[in-house]
Amino acid sequence: MKDCAIARAKEAGAYNDGDAVIIMTGANQGIDLTAKAIINKGDKIIVENPSFIGSLNAFRTYECELLGVDVEADGMDVCKLEETLKANPDAKLLYTIPTFQNPTGTTMTLEKRKRVLELASEYNLLIIEDNPYGDLRFNGEDVATLKSMDTENRVIYCGSFSKILSPGMRLGYVIGPAELLEKVEMLKQVNDVHTPMLTQMMCVQFMKKYDISKYIEKNRKLYKEKCQCMIDAMEEYFPKGKVEWTVPDGGIFLWCICPTIEDIRPVVDKALEKKVAIVPGTNFAIDQNLPSNKFRLNFSSASKSDITEAVKRLGEVLNELL
């Protein structure tokens, strides 16, 4: 299984000789245990705002201080990152999803990634690079991972098989400098001893028997069709001029903004009455007590006909409430 993880990571330039590899029960376990190994109570952790709720909650568990940096159309605002580091030079860790970010679907440019690494070097910052969606690009060219450009052993890379094979498999991995991952490996043993062998064997046999690259390419084409289907439906059914959204080059998310309102929750509640679930922006925020006029859509699981129907129902709600 480790060989499979290394093979996938090498394609992203995310494995170096001397790196340690730990197989995880889902990439989120890797983030949680890595955070547990690194974070002490009161530490300052820099995260994108908004960011993945699972990771934010993992960090909160360890009673750290979360410092949010806004996400722009081309990824994290590196000017704000620099300001945050100047104000908090003792920050210990940066957590980022640079490719097809959750929830915004945005991708950090190569220039910004280089700047992130420069700032990490200047302020002696560790980085967790969470890359579960990197294989799901359906437009444009790949952007080099932070790990592939790291020359100072600062980046801990978290990858996933769940997103390319089956979400229910809960199979991921962490790659990083051996000295950084020693404690993570111990915590993994305490947590669940090891990732279920049956799941690992299924993944290994699949990758031996089939061409994983062709399988991923098939999924990319499907996600591209579903993404376009969702965008087409939004253009048809959403109120004109009252909803803005990202257009991702990959991944599984669309991020929507309703600039004419302050709080999306009435829309969320009304949509649920029509059996349409959307995730409010508050769920991904550093301060979840503040209202948000944003919401996330996911096009990965539903059929194209269901996507169209769901967006139509959501459009009815938006036309009523906006």
Regions found by a protein language model. Name each.
Residues 177-178, 208, 257-259, 300-302:
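Residue-level recognition of strand-loop junctions within catalytic nucleotide-signaling folds
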Residues 204, 220-231, 243-257, 267-269:
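Conserved glycine-rich beta-strand-loop-beta hairpin in the small C-terminal domain of fold type I
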